[in-house]
């Protein structure tokens, strides 16, 4: 469970996992039919794929648990199914929590390996976020905002390192609120894309 006050999730059967993988593919087809130009798979922030990836939340003892390769099986199967369901020319992105900020949890080294596997399967860009899978996370960064324990660009280093180590395109997120800051990230080669959310809503 996410916290000790939460109910313990039921372990999915292999058939249920297969059904969910197919559901992702079906959703991708609907997205194409609806006119979307990019598909992004959300593998971050405690969502289902993130729970499979994390050695903290994944307590399985079958082919979907244990080693990094096993824990990555569900998201990798999902990528394969979606990639096969959409046009070859359609960009496929994947969002990951590059670190859980928890000792013994998901970290940057595992994210780098996952990104290599995703690149091999046809993912075009990794959207590099972090955290969201444990209430015990401790962000080792300068704190600009005590309420969120974050600072401008605090996740950019993840995008930079994954890009450098794998060659895959990366997107940077996380308190990138000034145009000059965004341009600096791109000009330094720390990321290929800046994802903007709240600033568009504010303006």
For the regions a protein language model found, what residue spans apply to each?
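Flavin-dependent oxidoreductase catalytic cores
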Residues: 1-203
